[in-house]
Structures are given as structure tokens and as C-alpha cells.
Amino acid sequence: MLSLTRILRKKIPVHELAGKISRPPLRPFSVVVASDEKGGIGDGGTIPWEIPEDMQYFRRVTTNLRGKNVKPSPSKRNAVVMGRKTWDSLPPKFRPLSNRLNVVLSRSATKEQLLAGIPDPIKRAEAANDVVAVNGGLEDALRMLVSKEHTSSIETVFCIGGGTIYKQALCAPCVNVLQAIHRTVVRPASNSCSVFFDIPAAGTKTPEGLELVRESITDERVSTGAGGKKYQFEKLVPRNSEEEQYLNLVGRIIDEGCTKCDRTGVGTRSLFGAQMRFSLRNNRLPLLTTKRVFWRGVCEELLWFLRGETNAKLLSDKGIHIWDGNGSRAFLDSRGLTDYDEMDLGPVYGFQWRHFGADYISCKVDSEGKGVDQIANIVKSLIENPDDRRMICTAWNPAALPRMALPPCHMMAQFYVSNGELSCMLYQRSCDMGLGVPFNIASYALLTFLMAKASGLRPGELVHTLGDAHVYSNHVEPCRKQLKRVPRPFPFIVFKQDKEFLEDFQESDIEVIDYSPYPVISMEMAV
């Protein structure tokens, strides 16, 4: 149910140009390839080795979905992108590759001609929705696969060859959305290979700026196939230097930080003064990958802030329990807020954003037209005077702090426009590196996207300035575990539909695609 505050408030219109930043220009993708020590992948028509284990690996990687026990279906499956020669090299009985959308690149072949190569008429008819012909190269396929028709139904896109398509994968613009390379390394090298795929060695940088990092590699194994070829499964990912900023800071805090007591009684290791920068261009979303971040919670909370809400029950009813501890009867009473109903947080973030300076009575009292609407004022400046240096939103109101369940940690954001791009600098006074900061990074990235939609700008950069950056003592070991993980490329944000007003966006309107994080690392919240 919508709150009375949300229904009555004067809303912020979404700009007519908002649709231009609703999705990335190209669909992110991964490469799957088997190559020998010299980069050989075949002779242009056949694969010069028989490794049944590689075939099983290929099927598993390109077919399996990320959710536990989730089976592919037309409403959610992966896509495999291949050249015409690769399609023709598939045994007819295996065309199309099952449980995947088969995207075939050809300058001449039509979908009907591709389907005609399937001998079984029943299977040919069934394959009509499983094959797409694209008249062009990999870039054209990725542009098609990021369209509204495919964004939600395709989980991961895999480029599976041949040689020309692989080369396109490592060149701009496609390389800019490369997420991973799954490689089967075959030994010894085959003398019959005439087609090669040169993958840059880990740690080296290509002219396009690609630097690959090895995430994993198996021990060398011997195939049961003819010839007993040796093989290894290797996964390479583009280096994510932006997430490395976060990991390096966490490591430095653990190793060099000052041991301090704190309000919660848990204790911290702390450093003072740090900064991280994250690009938001082309809808890249800085959602950390070295552990799963609760995106739905990030999105629901930010939209709750944006509407000026202060009733934590609105979040709790949606399964978002991040404010339950601070909204509990016991916690409110400990703050002297005995007149508040349970889950009334007082004049916290959203109230300050939309009603700064107004008197706060309770979360049930409408404050429409009272105080300063900082968000609306910033949007007005972004449109009318984008060079303004006063586009600041602050949640830190000293006069209202005693009435807040919790003083704001992320307390001030300044917006900046350059060359049609909107950037945001966040100042955070208290920075819980284990739990809070990953959440805050994604939250202010989303805020920047939404402010760009309201002002007709493109998202630029998020600059995160940290004051007291700390790791709680009971988070040290979980953080050490996280530091051992190789960060993967960030995902992308898609707005499935635009709204007339900024406050009308729902979590269901916003989707994160190609998010492939490591599993959750449990950390207890200090209250």
C-alpha cells in the first residue's frame, strides 16, 4: 500500500531524454573456447582433438543458470553467439544447441536457411524460437541482445566462435563489455591448426586496455578421448581495478588500522580519510562481486529515501530488514525516543532530503510543502544551471540529530556536470567497510542514475569519500576471506520502463543484468 506522503507530495518529473540511459549500448558477454598452447582452435572446419570432458564442460558452462536448481526455459535461458561456419560445423542432430538461444552471425543466411539444415522436421519446427540470424558481426548481436525483447529472458551471453568472432570479442567496442573467458587449455599443441585465437597473457594489457586476471585453473588432467590429450579448465576475467580499490582499503585497515572502541561495543580497526572512484558510464553498476550484495535491499531503501519515507515498516513488509534493529522498541527507547511508534526512525535520510529544516512529528504525519526539498532543488539546478557549485544534498542536520533513531552515516552528496555527464561525490562520516559500504556504493550509484533520468544527463562517475573507514573486529576474518577472491567485472543496470515521475519508480522497474558474484559472506550487523 502506498503511504499518504507519497500520494500527496509534489513529484519530480522524469526528463524526456531519460530513455537514452535505460540500458547499456551492448549486452555483456563471456567467451568459451578450447585452444592449444599456441592458441590453435581448429582448421576452419573441424576441431583437431577429441576431448569428451571439454564437450561436457562446454555444455555445462553455456547451459546452466546461476540460480540453484533453476532449469532453462524460453523465459530464462542463456544465449550462444556463433559464426555461420561454427553453426555448420555442428552435427545436424545437435542443431540448435538445446536449452539455449542460438544466435548465428551471417552476411547472407536467413533464419529459414539455418533451420533448413535441421534434418528432423519435428525438431526443425520446434527450433523456430531457438534460432536467430543476425546480419552482421558480434557487435550487432550484442546490440540486439540488450534490447527489451531479450534483456530479461537471456541470463548470460556466450561467444563460442569461430576465429573471426573471437577476434571481434577482444576489440572495441565488444571488449568493453567482456565479462569472462572460459578456456580449455589443450596439450600438446596440434600441428593441424590453421585458425588461432590469441588470448592475452594474464597480467599484460592490450592496446584496447584489456588486462586479464586468472580467477581459477584446474590441475592438468588426461582425457579419456582418442589420443589421451591433456587439458585444464581456466577462467580469466578482465581486471576490476575499481573493486580492487575497496579490497585494498579493507586490507590496509585490517593491517594498519587503529584499534578503537565504538558505540556498539564491538570495537573496530579504523583509518581516517580515503577515496574511491567508480565509473557509471554505459550503465555499469558498481555492485561488488567478491561477495553477493543484497541488490533488492539497496534499491528498495534508496527509493524509500527518495520518497521521503521514515517508516521502517514499509521496508520490513517487503522483506527488507536492514532497519529493524534501529527501529525496534528497545533501541528507540535507548535513544530516548519513547514517544515514537515502533519502526518510526524519526527525521532520518529521506526526511532531510525532502523536508530539511521542517519540524518532525511522526512518520504518520504528512510534511508536504514543509522544509527544503533538496532533491527537487538539485534537479532544477541540473536542468537550468548545471555549472552550479551548490548542488548539495545533506542529511546531517545537527538540530534534528537527537530526534533520529540513528544519525546519518552517508551524510552528504554533491553533484557535478561535465560534458553532459552527471557525477556524484558522496561524503560518508562513518564507514562500515564489511556491511555498509558495499551497500552505500550501489545506493549512491543508483541515486546518480535516477538524478540523471530526472535531468536528461548521462551518468558519469561516483566518487566516494570516506571519513572514519573501519572494519568491525568481528568482521576481520570474514573480510580476510573476501580479500582472497579475484573480483569479477561489475554488472549493468537496466530500467525496464520509465515513469512519469521520479518517485514512482518501483524496484520491479529496475533490473541488474550479468551480476555473477561470489557467494554471500555472513557478517553480523553492529547495532
UniProtKB/Swiss-Prot annotation:
Record SUPFAM superfamilies:
Dihydrofolate reductase-like (SSF53597), Thymidylate synthase/dCMP hydroxymethylase (SSF55831)
Q: Where is the signal peptide?
A: none
Q: Which domain of life is it from?
A: Eukaryota
All copies of domain DHFR, residue ranges = 28-238
UniProt KW Endoplasmic reticulum keyword: no
Which UniProt keywords are listed? Methyltransferase, Multifunctional enzyme, NADP, Nucleotide biosynthesis, One-carbon metabolism, Oxidoreductase, Transferase
**Known catalytic reactions:** dUMP + (6R)-5,10-methylene-5,6,7,8-tetrahydrofolate = 7,8-dihydrofolate + dTMP; (6S)-5,6,7,8-tetrahydrofolate + NADP(+) = 7,8-dihydrofolate + NADPH + H(+)
Location of the active site: 409
List every stretch annotated Thymidylate synthase: 243-527
Which GO cellular component terms are attached?
A: cytosol; mitochondrion
Provide the binding site for dUMP.
263, 410, 428-432, 440, 470-472
Show the CDD domains listed in the entry.
DHFR (cd00209), TS_Pyrimidine_HMase (cd00351)
Entry-linked Gene3D superfamilies: Dihydrofolate Reductase, subunit A, Thymidylate synthase/dCMP hydroxymethylase domain
Q: Which NCBIfam families match?
A: PRK01827.1-3 (NF002497), thym_sym (TIGR03284)
The protein's job, in short, is: Bifunctional enzyme. Involved in de novo dTMP biosynthesis. Key enzyme in folate metabolism. Catalyzes an essential reaction for de novo glycine and purine synthesis, DNA precursor synthesis, and for the conversion of dUMP to dTMP.
**Protein name per its UniProtKB record:** Bifunctional dihydrofolate reductase-thymidylate synthase
Q: Organism, per UniProt?
A: Trypanosoma brucei brucei
